[in-house]
Each structure stands twice: as structure tokens, then as C-alpha cells.
């Protein structure tokens, strides 16, 4: 996926003999995965052929399963995004019906793309919480099934699935094709409804001894009695996270503090972090002051 190159360059890069490389590349050309782009200009001597990936040969699908929405995309071999959907309303619950909702969302999105389903090589699924990509299991959701979540999705959708934690997936994306692509070691801080860290060490995702390195939001940090989603008290996430802001804003509205979010709270009986950010942009005093106090600021 490094772009265009000659057989000689492939031989040096992969440490494979010229006859073997020639045979393998020709097989890929015959399968319409690689394209012969013609001769490359050289100062002298025989001009070699240059080869590149055929964008329409293989596709990759991805889905981010969030706590309250899902995001989908389809890319080609050159990482060009062919189609994406970022506003699929969804509530992540530990119920079988939720798996069905995930699967139907994936299938409907792929169908709407209008591409050959058989050309989708893999489906990357990232989600919040503790995830083991080797076993394909989530240790927070859908734990009652004997089958792993990965196997359940593969069986239902019919495409090879890779399951990964959402923060680690974002970290690896930044490392491979983002602002950190030229770095060997990367530390990625995700602050959304939760707080977590993704780590790349010497070009590899770091999982730690437990396999769950990066659960930064669940470090005991505060002397409070707030129970975190992990079951412990005083985690960083109980005070500094989107969830913490939501909970505290709801509490203030219940106490009668003036805010333009009051009507929405009365309708929904809850407030989402996006609602608070929108209200802050509209100069709602409570939202402005509270997000400023809760969210971290740059300190010297």
C-alpha cells in the first residue's frame, strides 16, 4: 500500500528474488489487484515497468460502535474514503438486540454503497471498553454469549472482522496515516464521553501485560464517592469526561439552574455532551462556564 514501484524496488523491499516477485506480481495483475502503469523514465538503459494498486480491486469497511451512535465508512486500497456515514443514532447496550442493530446497520450501509460486496476484504470494528483483538471479545458488552463478538458479526455479516478498542484504533490510524506517521513512538489521548490513551512503541500497538494498557480514565484519581462505569470510585473519568459533564449538568438543571437546555432535558430526561457544546456555542452561560471549568486547559 506504499504506492507505485518497480519489480526491482519490490525485490529490495521484500528481500525476495526477481523471478518470485515477477510471478507474484503477475498473479496480482491477472486478478486485477495490481495494475501495470507502463514504463518509468530512467537516465539510461532498459526502462522498467512500474506497478500500482488497482483502487477498485479491493475495499475495506469500518464501523465505530459508540455509546450512542455508530459511524461507517468504505475505503479503497489507497485509503480513499468512498462513502461514510457519521450520524447513525444508536444506543450501545449489553443485549442481543443490540448486536442485531449493529449488523443491520453495517449491512444497510454496505448495500447503499453500491459496490461489489465480494470485494470487501475486511471489516474493522472498533468500540469502547476492554477489547481483546486476538480472541475477538469485548469484556464489557455481549459477554454472555459463548461466541465472541467478532465471530457473531462475521457469521451474520459474512465478512472477515477485526475487533479493536476504539482509542487504540484511533491511535494506530494517527500512526499510519495521520500527523504521527513519521514517528516510531506515539501517545494518543482521547477525550470524549470517556478518557483513554492509545500507545505505539517501536511501531507496534502496546497492549501491556494485561492486554488493556491505556485505560487512563479508570485510574483512581479523586477522593469522591462517585461510582465509575468500571465499578470503582474516584476514577479520573468521574470528574473529567463527557459523561461527568453530562451528569453534573443534569444535576444542575434538576436544581433549577437557568439554562437553555432545560426544555431539552424535560423532553429527554438527559443531556448529551453534544447538546452542551452546542449550547455553549450559543452563549448559554451555564454551558460556557461549566465546560470551561470541567475540561482541562493548557497549564505552564
Residues covered by each model-derived region:
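Nucleotide/phosphate-binding catalytic cleft detector across ATP-hydrolyzing
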Residues: 1-47
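Conserved phosphate-binding catalytic cores of ATP/NTP-utilizing and phosphoryl-transfer enzymes
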Residues: 36-60, 165-188
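Gly/Thr-rich phosphate-binding beta-strand-loop-beta motif of the actin/hexokinase/Hsp70
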Residues: 47-82, 190, 195-200
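Hydrophobic "anchor" residues
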Residues: 81, 138, 205-206
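Glycine-rich phosphate-binding loop and adjoining helix at the ATP-binding site
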Residues: 84-185
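Glycine-rich phosphate-binding loop of actin/hexokinase-like ATP-binding domains
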Residues: 182-239
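Active-site core segments that coordinate phosphate-bearing ligands/cofactors
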Residues: 218-271
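Conserved small/polar residues in nucleotide/adenosyl-binding loops
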Residues: 291-300
Amino acid at each position: 500500500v506504499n504506492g507505485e514501484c518497480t519489480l526491482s524496488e519490490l525485490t529490495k523491499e521484500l528481500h525476495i528474488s526477481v523471478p518470485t516477485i515477477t510471478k507474484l506480481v503477475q498473479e496480482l495483475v491477472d486478478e486485477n489487484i495490481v495494475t501495470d502503469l507502463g514504463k518509468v523514465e530512467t537516465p539510461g538503459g532498459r526502462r522498467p515497468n512500474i506497478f500500482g494498486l488497482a483502487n477498485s480491486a479491493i475495499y475495506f469497511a469500518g464501523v465505530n460502535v459508540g455509546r450512542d451512535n455508530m459511524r461507517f465508512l468504505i475505503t479503497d486500497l489507497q485509503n480513499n474514503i468512498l462513502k461514510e456515514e457519521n450520524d447513525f443514532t444508536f444506543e450501545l447496550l449489553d443485549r442481543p438486540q443490540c448486536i442485531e442493530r449493529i449488523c443491520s446497520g453495517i449491512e444497510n450501509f454496505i448495500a447503499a454503497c453500491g459496490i461489489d460486496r465480494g470485494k470487501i476484504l475486511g471489516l474493522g470494528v472498533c468500540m469502547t471498553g476492554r477489547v481483546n483483538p486476538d480472541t475477538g471479545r469485548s469484556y464489557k458488552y455481549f459477554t454472555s454469549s459463548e461466541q465472541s463478538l467478532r465471530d457473531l458479526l462475521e457469521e451474520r455479516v459474512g465478512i472477515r472482522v477485526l475487533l479493536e478498542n476504539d482509542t487504540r484504533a484511533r491511535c494506530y490510524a494517527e500512526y499510519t496515516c495521520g500527523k504521527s506517521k513519521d514517528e516510531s513512538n506515539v501517545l494518543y489521548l482521547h477525550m470524549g464521553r470517556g478518557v483513554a490513551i492509545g500507545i505505539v512503541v517501536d511501531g507496534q500497538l502496546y497492549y501491556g501485560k494485561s492486554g488493556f494498557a491505556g485505560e487512563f480514565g479508570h485510574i483512581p484519581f479523586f477522593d469522591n464517592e462517585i461510582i465509575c462505569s468500571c465499578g470503582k470510585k474516584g476514577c479520573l473519568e468521574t470528574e473529567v469526561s463527557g459523561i461527568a459533564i453530562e451528569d453534573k449538568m443534569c444535576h444542575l438543571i434538576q436544581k433549577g439552574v437557568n439554562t437553555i437546555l432545560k426544555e431539552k432535558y424535560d423532553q429527554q430526561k438527559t443531556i448529551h455532551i453534544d447538546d452542551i457544546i452546542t449550547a455553549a456555542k450559543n452563549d448559554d452561560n451555564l454551558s460556557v462556564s461549566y465546560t470551561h471549568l470541567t475540561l482541562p486547559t493548557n497549564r505552564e
